[in-house]
Amino acid sequence: MPCCRRTVFVEDLPLIGCIAFGLIDRGTNVIQVRPSSMCPLSCIFCSTDAGPKSRHRLTEYVVDLDLLIEWFEYIVKFKGEKKIEAHIDTVGDPLAYPRLVELVQRLSEVKGVEVISLQTHGVLLTEKIVDELAEAGLSRINLSIDALDPLLAKKLAGTERYDLHHVMRIAEYIASKPNIDLLIAPVWVPGINDHEIPKIIEYALKIGAGKKWPALGIQKYEAHKRGRKPRGVKLMSWGQFYRKLAELEKKYKTKLILRPEDFGIHKRPMIPILYQKGEKVLVEIVEKGWLKGELLAVDKKRQRVITVVETQVPIGTKMYVKIIANKHNLYIAKPL
């Protein structure tokens, strides 16, 4: 059965260290901004098991806006305060964040921020919200449309409430706006929506997506340990995926194999990784974790949040843990 979850308002935790909320720096000029983990959909291919039908999630997070901006400014300053892209891409849908327009406005006011982009399935978007986001400074909406067949679209979204016609109307509205760009970003799920991908390409080109950036960003479905795995799907290799994209590029004469430079993405210093794999760290347990079997902890100086697995101790417990993962400052640890 779908899990029951609690919602935590994050107002005094470090915003570096957890994949579910806060900020992620992967060593480029793009900073991932994750103000909320919630999502109204339960897509059958979701890599983060989001939405009402989640089986693995224990907690949802909503981050205080002032705290988010404070930590964002810290990372921007570290990177040199120039040519920064703030990419709002949650483990759910950013439109679930109640202060999204204000977030975009505040991000746009940070010195060095030149692009603000957002990833969404669009079900919570309206023409009014699009206007407000554009006025606040949003540069581009990456809109996931995974099928143009209404029944298949509902199946992929994991809910009968998914309204494809609404999302298409919003897509066309965004494309008509001169001050905001649209990128259509379907997930290609082999054996399920193969025949939809050419239709989506034709649709994106027809409505005028990609005024400044590429019109399409086709995503390869990947099976993740705690993500959803549609029955009967056989994964494409990356080689197969790129060969298919190359064929479609040739047919439609549009760019489908994307590179970082297509978006102005380049390497930039990454904020320091404070703890190495195998290192012993004293932490305090401060919250339930994002997924079942996890707890959230902070280090002694409250500089990083650390996900602790394989233990269930009371909140407030101080304990030593061993870091087992630290890539891009996303920390996972086990108790000693």
Specify the residue positions occupied by each region the protein language model found.
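N-terminal [4Fe-4S]-dependent radical SAM core
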Residues: 1-35, 48-59, 74-82
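Short cysteine clusters
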Residues: 39-46
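Core AdoMet radical
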Residues: 47-68, 75-97, 108-126, 134-169, ...
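Alpha-helical scaffolding segments of alpha/beta enzyme cores, especially the outer helices
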Residues: 67-70, 74, 99-109, 128-132, ...
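Short, electropositive alpha-helical surface patch
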Residues: 101-107, 193-214, 272-283
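Conserved C-terminal portion of the radical SAM core fold
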Residues: 165-228, 240-260
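A C-terminal junction/extension of Radical SAM enzymes
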Residues: 222-227, 237-294
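Terminal RNA-binding accessory module
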Residues: 264-336
